[in-house]
């Protein structure tokens, strides 16, 4: 095989309002807006990974094919914070120990507990070990 491999440099999110999403994601991840170039708004780099928001004309209409998993020590507290920043709960799960959330334009991401991830023989992941679940109703 060759002597080099590719590395992830940036995560770019297509959106209608890059200022709005940069504000949401910047507050969520503790990153500042550092640049605006053409249709892009850029957040500060953390751990080598850049994050930008590109303005596009088309609205989001289907489920993401790629999403981020954000690890947190307290799922319910982080859920409340996401909602206060303008995000929302996207789906409920009875098991698995994670929450599917959406940013203000509907881009899905997951909140997962810090720690262990177990994968069964069918490839299904359970976050945080056995017995951890989260409420499935939005009011919990």
What positions do the PLM features span?
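Vicinal oxygen chelate
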Residues: 2-13, 42-44, 49-54, 83-140
């Amino acid at each position: 095989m060759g002597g080099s491999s590719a590395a992830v440099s940036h995560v770019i999110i297509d959106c209608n309002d890059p200022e709005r999403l940069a504000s949401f994601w910047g507050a969520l991840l503790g990153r500042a807006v550092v640049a605006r170039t053409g249709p892009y708004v850029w957040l500060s780099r953390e751990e080598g990974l850049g994050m930008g928001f590109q303005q596009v004309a088309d609205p989001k209409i289907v489920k993401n094919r790629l999403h981020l998993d954000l690890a947190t020590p307290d799922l319910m507290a982080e859920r409340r914070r996401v909602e206060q920043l303008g995000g929302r709960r996207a789906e409920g799960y009875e098991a698995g120990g994670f929450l599917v959330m959406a940013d203000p334009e509907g881009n899905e991401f997951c909140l997962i507990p810090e720690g262990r991830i177990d994968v069964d023989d069918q490839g299904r992941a359970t976050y945080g070990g056995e017995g951890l679940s989260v409420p499935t109703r939005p009011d919990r």
